[in-house]
Structures are given as structure tokens and as C-alpha cells.
Curated annotation (Swiss-Prot):
GO terms for molecular function: structural constituent of ribosome. The gene is rpmF. This is Large ribosomal subunit protein bL32. Residues 1-20 have a biased composition (Basic residues). InterPro entries: Ribosomal_bL32 (IPR002677), Ribosomal_bL32_bact (IPR044957), Ribosomal_zn-bd (IPR011332). Pfam families: Ribosomal_L32p.
Amino acid sequence: MAVPKRRTSRSNTRSRRAQWKAKAPALAKCSRGHTIRPHTMCPTCGRYNDRQVLDV
């Protein structure tokens, strides 16, 4: 099994870990103007793609 020849420095470790960040979710507007995730039904008005799919 491979063993590291040298210890990884703290700055190298932290620089590598700095890339592990969560992305903000993409947001869209429903036809009534509410902010939703794309390709999902609006939980406020129950519409998807300008159609009523759920009675809220």
C-alpha cells in the first residue's frame, strides 16, 4: 500500500479543502412570481409550467 513520503502542509491541506464548498441552489420564478427551484411545482400556488397541478 502506498504511503506518503512527506506530511502535507497545513496551507496545502486548507487550499485543497477551500474548493469543497456548497453551491447556492438555482432559483427561478413561477408564473405568479414566487421564487422556486427550477423544474418543480410551486408550493405556494400549486402550479407547474403554468398549469394548476395541486389545489392549495
